[in-house]
Every structure is written in structure tokens, then in C-alpha cells.
Design a protein with these regions (language model features):
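Bacterial signal peptide processing site
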Residues: 17-19
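C-terminal motif of bacterial Sec signal peptides marking the signal peptidase cleavage site
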Residues: 12-15
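Hard-cation-handling environments
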Residues: 256-270
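Sec-dependent signal peptide recognition
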Residues: 1-7
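Active-site/substrate-binding loop(s) of hydrolase catalytic cores
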Residues: 91-100, 108-236, 242-255
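Soluble metallo-hydrolase cores and metallopeptidase-like ectodomains found primarily
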Residues: 45-97
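Acidic/histidine-rich, surface-exposed loop or edge segments in extracytoplasmic proteins
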Residues: 23-37, 99-101, 172
Length: 270
């Protein structure tokens, strides 16, 4: 009887124990702590999201599949409604946004930006409609992120240290979504089908070319796309995007590849 009472008291004390609060965690990113020229290591990214998961009910992390490095992909989700039996199979009308970060870990802007964005979504600094669900692959190319260096992007303006373009098997993952030769691509496909996103954002940046615009766009050629989709792209989507960003003082221009050629010969499109 005495043992039972002690067990009951212990359980009550345990249930009344104070849960972690956001202020119990250091949620300032390495980028913000530094001089603006640092990006976190893979282990720092994982530790950050573990803390964010513990600090906020709206944030949850999942380990999915495996990659060529042997590590699983980490999917981080922001969901203000955690009452679903499964946040991937709910019956509610939800707009799903999936973000892919770190396909080339030397182009690390998206990794840092998503860490800050997820925190600011969770703490209410960034407001979103209730029917918006956001998921992000924390680091897609884990093998490349673990292979940090300071010299493979000599023409790129920072960061001081960064990951390598090739993955653990030296694949350029930017070329493997269809072939799926790598475990990374197969794990990505698993996440993609599980989430079934309405919008996919690949946080991909240039690797040192001197673009005068912060943002460039690479739309499919409307005359190759054809029919209603081509017309929609050419007459509605692209002009609207250009106008909206110009109004925010973020003008964009077409992305082009330039390989020691003069402008007069033209630029290749995709």
C-alpha cells in the first residue's frame, strides 16, 4: 500500500513538473550570433531543431528514410493544429508548402533562413493563415554538409566555412530527382509523396556568379509548356510575380548561364 501511494505521489509530481518554455532554449541561430558570414554545421542544425521542437508545440521533427551518408533526412513541420491523427493525412483543407534546403550545402542561405523562419513562425513574429502547413527538409545533402571546407568556392562571397557540392557518393543531387540513383533522392520522394505539397520551394542560390539582382527566376519557356499552362505562365504568373516583387523593391530578372561568351550571341534558356 505504501509503495502504491509513493508511486501515485511520484506520478502526480511528474505530471505537475514544469514543461520546457521557449525561453529555456537558446534559439538564436549561429548566423545571427556571428558576423553575418557563418553558417551552422550539420550537427548545429540538428541540435537547433531539436530545441525548437521541444520549445513549441507547433514545431515537430521527423526522421525519414536514409541518405548516402547513412543519416536520415530531417523533416521539420510547422503546424498550428496538432489535433490531427496524422498531420499528413488530415481531412481539413490545408495549403501545404514544402521547402528543400541544402541540395548544395555551399549555397547555405536557405538553411539559415529556414531556421530563423521556423522560429519566427512558432513564436508569432511571422503570422500565417490557420490553413497553411509548412514543412522543410533541414539539410538535403547531408554528406556534402559534413564535408566542410573553405576553398572550393573561392569566387563566392562567404560563408567562411561551408559544405561541399557533391554528396557522400559525390553525386550532384540537383541531377538525380528522376534517376534516383542516390538514397537521398529516394528519401526525398518518400517525403514528397507523404506531404503531397501544393507548393515546393527549393532554396537554391548561385555559386559565386556576380548577379546584380538578389533574386532571379527560371521559368519554363511558355512556348515549350504550351496550351493553357503556357498562356497562364506567360500572361499571369510571371508578370504578377515580377510586379509584386518590384513593389517590394525586390526586382527580379531571368536567370542565365554565362560561360565566357559575349551577350550578343544570346543566352540559353531551359
Amino acid at each position: 500500500m505504501k509503495a502504491a501511494l509513493l508511486s501515485l505521489v511520484f506520478l502526480i509530481a511528474l505530471s505537475c513538473a514544469e514543461k520546457p518554455k521557449p525561453e529555456d532554449f537558446d534559439l538564436i541561430t549561429p548566423f545571427e550570433k556571428g558576423n553575418g558570414n557563418q553558417t551552422p554545421t550539420y550537427d548545429e542544425v540538428m541540435a537547433y531543431y531539436e530545441d525548437l521542437d521541444a520549445a513549441y508545440v507547433s514545431i515537430k521533427t521527423y526522421k525519414i528514410g536514409r541518405t548516402d551518408s547513412g543519416e536520415p533526412l530531417t523533416l521539420v513541420t510547422y503546424n498550428t493544429n496538432r489535433t490531427f491523427d496524422s498531420e499528413f493525412a488530415d481531412a481539413k483543407e490545408v495549403t501545404r508548402i514544402l521547402i528543400n534546403n541544402g541540395i548544395h550545402p555551399g549555397e547555405s542561405d536557405g538553411i539559415d533562413a529556414t531556421m530563423m523562419m521556423m522560429r519566427d513562425l512558432a513564436n508569432g513574429t511571422i503570422e500565417t493563415p490557420e490553413n497553411v502547413w509548412i514543412g522543410a527538409i533541414a539539410v538535403y545533402n547531408i554528406g556534402g554538409a559534413l564535408n566542410r571546407n573553405t576553398g572550393t568556392r573561392a569566387n563566392q562571397n562567404g560563408p567562411e566555412e561551408y559544405g561541399f557540392r557533391g554528396n557522400a557518393q559525390n553525386y550532384d543531387l540537383n541531377r538525380d530527382f528522376v534517376k534516383a540513383d542516390t538514397y537521398n533522392a529516394r528519401a526525398f520522394a518518400e517525403i514528397y509523396h507523404m506531404v503531397d505539397p501544393d507548393v515546393l520551394i527549393d532554396n537554391h542560390v548561385s555559386n559565386g556568379a556576380d548577379y546584380q539582382y538578389v533574386l532571379t527566376h527560371l521559368f519554363t519557356q511558355h512556348n515549350k509548356l504550351g496550351d493553357e499552362l503556357g498562356d497562364y505562365l506567360h500572361t499571369e504568373l510571371q508578370p504578377q510575380l515580377e510586379q509584386d516583387l518590384a513593389a517590394k523593391d525586390w526586382p527580379i530578372t531571368p536567370y542565365v548561364n554565362v560561360f565566357s561568351q559575349v551577350p550578343e550571341i544570346g543566352f540559353s534558356q531551359f
